[in-house]
């Protein structure tokens, strides 16, 4: 954990950011995201010299870095039903990349569920980008990585509505992560 624009990293920051990774990997075998050995924490949005834009978070697999805006991270967990959660979003990117990077944690996500996810993702991105009414916000249509990250935000924050709107995708993510938020939260379907 590396401070950027914050005085120091608190235990609360370490625990909560780590918990966001555990939330996604809880149903999987032990995953430590070993490729990502640096987590940079900014207090708020930060400027990227690479994109020439302000960002709230990002995952850079080449550099092994996860970057978090602390304010946006906290805001994401303050409202658990708006499907905007920076912690879930950035950790979704991290597990997506970690699964593809050849290391001791390579290919921990089930191949059958991943193949199904790829097909559903392609279908749904077309719907989003042709302005068809969609359960997900438009940003999910940017690419397969953003689709996955946005899908996991909805999976954990609006599971009942998600299952109703996109049952095949919900069931695929349930298999992929080996967990079901509806059962976990004991929600009515």
Per-segment meaning from a language model:
Residues 1-19, 32-33, 37-40:
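Propeptide-to-catalytic entry region of secreted or membrane-anchored zinc metalloproteases
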Residues 2-3, 14, 18-26, 46-81, ...:
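Metalloprotease/metallohydrolase-associated module, dominated by Zn2+-dependent proteases
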């Amino acid at each position: 954990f590396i401070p950027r624009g914050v005085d120091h990293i608190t235990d609360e920051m370490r625990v909560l950011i780590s918990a966001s990774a555990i939330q996604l990997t809880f149903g999987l075998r032990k995953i430590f995201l070993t490729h990502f050995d640096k987590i940079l924490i900014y207090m708020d949005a930060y400027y990227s010299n690479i994109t020439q834009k302000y960002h709230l978070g990002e995952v850079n697999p080449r550099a092994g870095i996860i970057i978090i805006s602390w304010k946006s991270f906290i805001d994401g967990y303050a409202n658990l039903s708006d499907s905007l959660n920076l912690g879930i979003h950035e950790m979704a990117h991290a597990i997506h990349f970690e699964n593809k990077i050849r290391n001791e944690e390579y290919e921990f996500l089930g191949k059958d569920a991943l193949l199904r996810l790829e097909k559903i993702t392609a279908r749904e991105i077309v719907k989003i980008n042709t302005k068809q009414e969609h359960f997900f916000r438009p940003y999910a249509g940017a690419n397969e990585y953003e689709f996955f990250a946005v899908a996991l935000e909805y999976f954990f924050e609006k599971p009942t509505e998600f299952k109703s709107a996109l049952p095949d995708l919900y069931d695929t993510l349930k298999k992929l992560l080996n967990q079901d938020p509806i059962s976990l939260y004991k929600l009515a379907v």
